[in-house]
Every structure is written in structure tokens, then in C-alpha cells.
Design a protein with these regions (language model features):
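Alpha-helix/helix-capping structural signal
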Residues: 12-13, 42-45, 78, 122
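Residue-level recognition of specific faces of alpha-helices
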Residues: 28, 69, 82, 123-126
Length: 138
């Protein structure tokens, strides 16, 4: 029986892994266990957009390689409920985050995962109940 994933890797963490395949993120994945990490279809879409925007075939190939090695979770219910709650809460607080970040947070909450990122800790930490880690801050 395989261990269910515990960590959802965000776009900036996977971007760092693409830039530094033997770097800190790779070491953290190895320490956590490859079966304990996954990503969201939202993150995969953001990475693919970045590859198309750059026009770099080399970058697209690296993204293909990274994504082929990861479990990519489809966005399913009850993520929609979490999204509605998150968006309402952040709007009421007057402190919204981007739509893709809200979807990623909702996806992680619905799957019971910790979101791993770098620069976005501040905005993701405003989402009630969401566990976040910065694997590059240590």
C-alpha cells in the first residue's frame, strides 16, 4: 500500500526544482519521500502557461519531465466548497489573493495537504486552516 501524499507543491517550488534539479527542493522531496508529494492540475496549468509564454522548448521539456514524475491531482469536489469559503473570508477581510492561489488553497484543503511554496507564504497563510511550508527558507 502506498502512502497518500502529504504535500502539494506550488508553482514556485516546482519552478525552483526545474531551475535546480539537484537543489534544495529535490533534497526535500527525497527526505519526505517521493510518494508523499504531489501537485495540483492548477499548478501544472500555470507551469505550462509559463512554458508557452517563454517560447522555450527546453523549458517545456523540463516541465514535461518534472510533471511526469509527480502525481497531478484533478480538481474535484469538495474543493468548490472550500473555494467559496476562502474567497468569502478573504473578501470580507479585504485581503484577497489571486484566483489561482485560492483554487490551489482550496484544492489542498479538500485533499488534506500541506501547500509547499516559497514567496507566497504570506498570502497563503491568510487562508484559515491551510498548512503551509517554505522548503527554501531553512
Amino acid at each position: 500500500m502506498t502512502t497518500p501524499p502529504g504535500y502539494l507543491l506550488d508553482t514556485n517550488i516546482l519552478s525552483d526544482l526545474i531551475r535546480h534539479p539537484q537543489g534544495t527542493v529535490a533534497s526535500k522531496i527525497e527526505a519526505a519521500g517521493e510518494q508523499s508529494v504531489c501537485t495540483s492540475i492548477i499548478v501544472a496549468a500555470e507551469l505550462r502557461y509559463g512554458a508557452h509564454k517563454s517560447g522555450s522548448r527546453k523549458l517545456a521539456d523540463r516541465i514535461d519531465l518534472i510533471l511526469s514524475a509527480l502525481e497531478i491531482l484533478p480538481l474535484e469536489a469538495p474543493a468548490d466548497r472550500h473555494y467559496g469559503e476562502i474567497r468569502h473570508h478573504l473578501a470580507r477581510e479585504g485581503n484577497p489573493i489571486g484566483p489561482n492561489d485560492m483554487l490551489i488553497a482550496a484544492h489542498a484543503l479538500s485533499a488534506g495537504l500541506t501547500v509547499v511554496m516559497t514567496a507566497n507564504i504570506g498570502k497563503f497563510s491568510r487562508v484559515p486552516g491551510l498548512s503551509v511550508e517554505n522548503w527554501l527558507a531553512e
